[in-house]
Amino acid sequence: QLTLLSQWLRSEGHLVVFSEWNSSPIVSTTTSRGKKRQLLTPLTFSLIHSTDFSDRIERDIIPALKAGAIVLADRYVYTAFARDVARGVDRSWVRSLYRFATLPTLAIYFRVPLDVALYRILSGRPKLKWYEAGMDLGLHSDVTESYKLFQGRIQDEYEHIVREYGLAVMDATRPVEIQQRALRQLITPYLRGEAPGPMGP
């Protein structure tokens, strides 16, 4: 959806910068090695992702905003809020860890049922990944059941975040073109300067 949105914004004459979660070169190698060896603890995940986010804020996001660009972030601090808390990390501690975050103008939660999310993943690759299924938490010996339990925790936490921070919610089960139309309608007031300012992190 963000790729389509980015293309549309550029066609409308806007300068657009894209920032992706866990993409900083500072930590990408460390993260990859840790996952392969199954060495990452919940706290380690928090610290690594915070380091990644901090680097992208300073290197990509803030300079782009100062240049007048629209920054589209594929996942933001709310990803850490949901995943880390689902892994058992203290909610207040995680929020404090990201207190440096630039306030987003708009944050959107693409809501999708667990069974649909699972189907989409397995349609693209043969099996679930160890950490994405929450196997490190010992929730269940079966990887699929562990995924459902872990992702269920994440979804519950996202619902808490939606209420706490006022995230916009999109039904991610709808056809792509309908979602894209809704996205454009949602952000148009912001482009015209008719919407409220930044929301809380």
Residue ranges and their predicted role:
Residues 1-11:
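A conserved segment at the C-terminal end of the G1
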